[in-house]
Amino acid sequence: MNNSTNSSNNVALTSPYKTFEVVFIVLVAGSLSLVTIIGNILVMVSIKVNRHLQTVNNYFLFSLACADLIIGVFSMNLYTLYTVIGYWPLGPVVCDLWLALDYVVSNASVMNLLIISFDRYFCVTKPLTYPVKRTTKMAGMMIAAAWVLSFILWAPAILFWQFIVGVRTVEDGECYIQFFSNAAVTFGTAIAAFYLPVIIMTVLYWHISRASKSRIKKDKKEPVANQDPVSPSLVQGRIVKPNNNNMPGSDDGLEHNKIQNGKTPRDAVTENCVQGEEKESSNDSTSVSAVASNMRDDEITQDENTVSTSVGHSKDENSKQTCIKIVTKTPKGDQCTPTNTTVELVGSSGQNGDEKQNIVARKIVKMTKQPAKKKPPPSREKKVTRTILAILLAFIITWAPYNVMVLINTFCAPCIPNTVWTIGYWLCYINSTINPACYALCNATFKKTFKHLLMCHYKNIGATR
């Protein structure tokens, strides 16, 4: 009991803050730590459970959230303890481990921001070649490299500097990096760890913004009529004429014809066909389907991803139908253009069947000749660019005060009060609190997924857009 009392008296004597100030600091710092932990766990869980968030860019954000989570759990709370007590009570080993963890994680955050900036830069400047290389495996390798490099740069120097120079110069009750007592080293590390990355990221974002604006202006200047239509020579038709008996398992006559300007050559190749409804769905294709029967009217429905044409209605259940299907395959990437179009026609042997096939075929070929409507720039690309801008601004605003003080301290150590140092250091930590808010504000999918998780609405959360 006496030891405990003496320890409490020592804390009271050495603490620079009064009791109510200590309570206030602990409440504020504890709240920030809790918000940081919850926010970054939400980011990580959202990416894990929502398949629409499982993109290469968001994997980089997942790595950044891991770093921010570590800061919220360890760095914030240990620094709060150090601040309110007024001295370091946990000994030199824990001090060095905390500093190593703190600086490795902080540097990993900067490295992740650099990776995100370079990734977006290459996506914009090399849209044809870079997306091919931009795989999940490559993203994992880049993330691993960022963490390993950060560890190599900071951990050995912090943990073993005292053994390299042969003496520990950090006094008991204090906790700081020993080689930071050298003004030149402090200046150099500030340049390498903050100023150089900020310059690189700013230049990259300027190029990203410039390229995006240039593309938007170019798209606005191009009239819709000048866009390349889908070439009718790429449209291939397949007409299927089932036998009159049309029993399950029976062989149907199959004719393959090319449709050019609404006409089909007489030469045909006969194959077997299994009757039934066919459906195709792919991230890299757009489907257009048409169904024709006893035609009474024409219906055309279009949306962003599919075009569906229904011609006529069936008078009875036994009447046969004519099906036309167009599958437009497009390459992977942020911007896709049609590369091949296939038309399949399934016809009936009923009366006027050939007439109906020709009418529907002409409609489809006419539709494929029409130029596609001009689409605005992809919203996903805008989301990514806005998110990058938000996290870069948050990083610069929160880290700049401390790193400016580091440079000032190099030339004038007494110029900066201890309280200002503490606030500047805490601002660096607050960046980890702000990042999840940046994701939610700039990306509606993140925001909706956060809301579902917080309100325990787990139904269909994996498909939230």
From Swiss-Prot:
Composition bias type Basic and acidic residues, residue spans: 253-269
Record topological domains on the Cytoplasmic side: 45-58, 119-138, 209-386, 442-465
Positions of short motif Important for signaling: 119-121, 435-439
Main subcellular location of this protein, as a coarse class: membrane
Residue ranges that the UniProt entry lists as topological domain Extracellular: 1-21, 80-96, 162-183, 410-417
Glycosylation sites: 2-3, 6
Protein name in UniProt: Muscarinic acetylcholine receptor M2
Protein species of origin: Bos taurus (Bovine)
